[in-house]
Amino acid sequence: MQKLLTYFFLLMFLLQTEAYAQSEIESIKKSISANTIFIRHALAPGFGDPPDFTKEDCSTQRNLNNKGRLQAQLIGDYLKKSNLLFSEILTSEWCRCIDTAKELDIGQWETFSGLNSFFEGHEKKDTVMAKLRKKLASRKPSDLVLFVTHQVVITELTDEVPRSGEMVLYNSITKQKSRFMVDF
């Protein structure tokens, strides 16, 4: 009987913990009426990209390591449990962002050049940001969109500097924002 009670209380604790975790991101979303969630790609050791960078060749890029893949999977698990429904999932054309989107495993995604990094001049900042702003302006404010991108893109739009795997919930109308990190 004692063992049964122990299991019961452990189960109740786990259910409460999960319910809290699920409601935290939903609460933030609701508090600012976020219609966009930016996520910086998961852990990819290093800085920038190698000198021989080619967008179409992942071997010339800084990529996710095993810890980064695990991080993206755990973020995906968290998002699945949160019951957030994304009308669209878009990712930068960089391999570390594409791999993050794949590892999230939360739905169909497409690449979008309006999320590409302009750090080190591989893309033109004005071009990238114009595409992103046009995308934000062209959709229904009630739709929730997930963008997998780079720190420079998120910072340029929101003035936030997210860590790898960190999310910035954003209201594209009011410009309100809030950062959120799934610990792993």
Question: Model regions: which residues?
Answer:
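Bacterial N-terminal signal peptides
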Residues: Y7-Q16
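Active-site-proximal alpha-helix that buttresses catalytic centers in soluble enzyme cores
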Residues: Q22-H122, E160-F184
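Alpha-helical scaffold elements lining the catalytic groove of polysaccharide deacetylases
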Residues: H122-V128
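A short, acidic, amphipathic alpha-helical segment used as a generic capping/interface helix at domain edges
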Residues: M129-S138
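Generic beta-sheet signal
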Residues: A34-I37, P141-T149
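Positively charged n-region of N-terminal signal peptides that target proteins for export
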Residues: M1-T6
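Bacterial Sec-dependent signal peptides at the C-terminal "C-region" and cleavage site
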Residues: L15-S23
